[in-house]
């Protein structure tokens, strides 16, 4: 695809805060190569470290930023704003302001389908996602198809339809994606450099603008995280084997989320992670009591929970910042669950998802991983994937009894993932470049950014779902038109 052919050609693009590391700097190079004029605002020395040239340094207060933003958009005649995380204080007003001014907004976020994807959506992500708003229409399309009763997902995460081999849906990118590999240490390296630079430059910038503390203490918490990782590896030796052996199919896995993640603070009704832990324990204790009372009616497909336990898994990125051991012990005693609760840290998550009886979470993207491994999932908050046929739709109080009969439908899950990838995901990582891709940012773009920011009104087919409908009205995967020049490394389609 030539530069002139790119929808970004002639566009004026504003980059606000991006992920830690050089991703936004490299993306700016790709945008310029496509013919766009790029403007960048830095808010702290960490931003400056990875994007030092041709930028605007903002060092005022949050209120001053709110006053400056509309002036900046007007002064530079901005056509599109790109940012990472739509709930950060400096980004929170961008969506409404841009909508009023007719400016496109593209939001990056960690991938819904990790580790091989990052998220890029117009308008917003998670609870602000357009995909989330259009799920009702998608569900109508699935109802028109009829629920595939013969197919379900077994505990190995494979389709169990007679004679049917599991495969990615036609027209999706699932079968064509490139594996990213483990990029934990890449992200950790960029993160440490970012926070150290931000702390070192605190005299020259207003670090209070950042959504997390940028102090020397925060750096110490990251050092504490590495120390705790080694400590828990020693103290929790043997836990993985116990869960995969003695307790296999007898434990419910509860993945905890980062304490100040917007998924908790903005997109859930829980005041804190501790509030969620309390809710889960109270419900499970009630289920144990309910089973022992004959007058209490149990669900139709109820199975005993008397031999089951709860396993709370700490989020690895929150290891140095929070420790819920004391709260877990207190709540365990309060709800009479002694001997039925484990609090763990760094076990191999995919193996746990395969071995557990079910998964309970607020709205973490771990839920999609769990579904992929065939685990029944109960969502206690608001999540994109919390739809009938994929997750358990009943009450948490009943999930404990009905988990084994709440396996996700394989065909439904495949259709959903195909739509999710096509509409919201980009193959790659913010922290580690995919080898061999044509874009300096290291993510496989293939024209998808422009398509999502400025969707064409053309009619597109929905493979395996329904006849043709308007592109803006369908969540079904777009029909593949074969590899473009960008796919082969000859172009720069964004």
Predicted regions, residues:
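N-terminal subdomain of nucleotide-sugar transferases
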Residues: 1-44
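Active-site donor-nucleotide binding/catalytic segment of nucleotide-sugar enzymes
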Residues: 16-20, 245-277, 281-282, 288-298, ...
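Active-site and donor-binding regions of nucleotide-sugar-utilizing enzymes
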Residues: 20-26, 43-137, 159, 367
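Alpha-helical membrane-targeting segments
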Residues: 123-127, 168-241
